[in-house]
A protein has these predicted regions:
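Protein-protein interaction and targeting regions used for scaffolding, dimerization, and localization
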Residues: 1-36
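Short beta-strand-centered segments at strand-helix junctions
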Residues: 39-41, 46-88, 93-140, 145-178, ...
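Structural signal for hydrophobic packing residues in well-ordered secondary-structure cores
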Residues: 17-25, 58-62, 217, 225
Length: 234
């Protein structure tokens, strides 16, 4: 018997299985066979605070107070809001804090918000804060000056392992999202997969994107793996 000199890792096997499932299901997985309903939500400008910064802005011992639970279990919009100040004293007031607290403070804005503040902000996955601009946060009890932490959140989809298997994708892959609405049907590319066994299937796009595709009046949404380029180059 001939022995294979190169072993296949578990992650490679999982990827091959997902690809095979994706081929069986077709480039756009059938919604009727999906393990979970596809939900697309607009993520408006918001802030994630560290406990340290929460206490600077709202007073020693401050805790986030729940105003509304979010779609993902354990996450919520807090009653607390702060003002964001950019260069040349440009300000956006009443920006909602989301909970629970995180290890690092992070500000998530749409493109039009960054223009209003006078900031050049990169598109990043949540938590990737190196080489990002900072800003000033103003609360009722104090001020925090961030040297980094302002991002435009990359459009992304939260998926469980069952969802990934259904769509034929893996953590970090980029999918396409087709949104059908009257007069402005659009396909959004580069929807980053964020796999976690504890999440519900949910796509997040920002306010600019949601308005551009008229998400509030969408008649259909479909998530699918992009097909490889079939064009012939000379």
């Amino acid at each position: 018997m001939t022995q294979l000199t190169n072993s296949i890792s578990r992650s490679q096997i999982e990827q091959l299985v997902r690809q095979a499932l994706g081929q069986q299901l077709g480039s756009a997985a059938s919604p009727s066979s999906a393990p979970n309903p596809l939900v697309v939500n607009i993520s408006a400008r918001h802030i994630h605070l560290s406990q340290e910064h929460l206490e600077v802005l709202f007073g020693k011992g401050a805790q986030l107070e729940i105003q509304k639970d979010l779609y993902q279990e354990g996450y919520f919009a807090a009653t607390q809001t702060v003002a964001i100040v950019g260069p040349r004293r440009r300000m956006i007031p009443n920006v909602r804090v989301l909970g629970p607290c995180r290890g690092d403070t992070q500000v998530e804005l749409a493109f039009t918000d960054t223009i209003s503040l006078g900031l050049e902000v990169p598109i990043r996955i949540s938590g990737d804060l190196e080489n990002t601009p900072g800003c000033v946060l103003m609360g009722p009890k104090g001020v925090v000056e961030l040297d980094k932490g302002v991002i435009r959140a990359a459009r992304h989809v939260h998926m469980s392992p069952a969802d990934c298997a259904h769509y034929g994708c893996a953590n970090g892959d980029k999918l396409h999202l087709r949104i059908e609405s009257n007069g402005c049907t659009t396909v959004l590319e580069d929807v980053v997969v964020r796999e976690n066994p504890e999440v519900k299937l949910e796509v997040h796009i920002d306010t600019d994107e949601g308005n551009a595709v008229d998400l509030d009046h969408a008649t259909s949404v479909k998530l699918f793996v992009p097909e490889g380029c079939k064009c012939k180059h000379s």
